[in-house]
Amino acid sequence: MLMNRKAKTVNVLEGPMTESCAEFPARHVFIKCPECRRVIDEARLHDNLEVCPRCGKHFRVSGRARMRMTVDEGTFEEWDANLASEDFLSFPGYADKLKSVSERSGERDAVVCGRGKICGCDTALFFMDANFMMGSMGSVVGEKICRAFERATELGLPVVGFTVSGGARMQEGVTSLMQMAKISAAVRRHSEAGGLYITVLTDPTTGGVTASFAMEGDIILAEPDALTAFAGPRVIEQNMHKRLPKGFQRSEFLLEHGFCDAVVPRGEIALTVGELLALHEGHAPGLGAPHEIVHTGRRGKKLGHLFKRSAAPKTALEIVKQTRSADRATAGEMISLGLDGFVELHGDRYFGDDAAVVAGIGWKDGRPVTVIAIERGTTTKERMRRNFGMAHPEGYRKARRLMRQAEKFGRPVLCLVDTSGAFCGIGAEERGQGEAIAQNLMEMSGLKTPIVSVVTGEGGSGGALALSVADRILMLSSSAYSVVSPEACASILWKDTERANEAAEALKLTAPDLLALGIIDGIVDDRG
């Protein structure tokens, strides 16, 4: 039996034909942040300087990318661009490794050196590159950085260096190791010529680079959460057979332990470095306040405004008690009032950063000055953090480090002293409290730059003297300066603390008393 089928019909389009391109949505590449595990648009990450906009994780960037982020556009002149590593030891696989890494990264070796401007300040620069064998230091890296320092010394330029490295390049044997000493010698010559060296530690900075030029800067900055270590975490864990605590050897760990001056987010590094370069050129920066370490002064007020919180004392003991008042003006308030700006620097480079001693570079009417101040704090929480103004050995060593810097760069030093005395405790003795004070006395007595010390509150014994060996010693009219507190004097000599008032009068600890004795050079009226 035959089946009927429907005839197929064909639709025919009549009229002229036109072509049109189909529109597809733009392609986006997404990256997962290893820290917060969130997905980020690659373009957004790039616009944010390769920093996760959600958690602040700083991704690694190439040396040239970092150069573009930091240097004023159109000002960079590269030095020694044609130097390239060779396999001079015939190390197995090294020649092929150099070729493949060079093709992939577009670089001849792991550092880019040159000259450029940061916020208008002329400087020599080097940028290490983790994309080339993890920034390992071989003979070419050493030679290029060494030449950069030598040129900077000849030209009278500061040096700003960005470090990233897995350490020495093993494929070049002891030649790689020798670069540590070679660069360090060049850094020393540059420093002796009065040159400023700023290092910026980025993730990771380890091994021989950490144990040489990375930690030799006059000022050391670090990106957040950057691993900085001599021995890496894996090496230590294998050695110790235990897990390391979270944050160990990271930037914040370095800051807490006194080995860097500040942790600065990537987006603020250029402006922060520009501020520091301007200050070392001998003029005040006019760039604003890029980072919390820069504080703008309050203008138009007089010192007396800070000291009219309580009635004028009548006796020596009342003066002493008033210096201890929580309402009394702090060093931070005086710095904010008296200076146009202030950049705080941290750390003694040995053990820690003592919050009781605030130190850094300030400027007034365009002129830079090194400021070292003992800070008691105001609130209970802050006073505890600052140990009630009783400095540890690391506080005095931080002060000495900043004094030496001031001498090197020809800045005057201003010390603001307000302490009941140096901290007495087991840890302070273990870390050499007496030695720290003694070294300060010797250092200040021969410092070849002007020093002015002002006793702004209580000047307690050796802890105060450690910042009071100066060309000019001043006291605020409501301050006190003594070998011992009146209460301790009465207790020790007379076994009677009720005689503290008598002891205060006998100790001659007021500003007029000490001026009459020739101990101080002048009195500053703090009552306006």
Predicted regions and their residues:
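Terminal-region recognition feature
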Residues: 1-198, 204, 216, 223, ...
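Glycine-rich anion-binding loops of enzyme active sites
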Residues: 206-213, 229, 463
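Catalytic-face loop-and-helix region of soluble metabolic enzyme cores
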Residues: 239-240
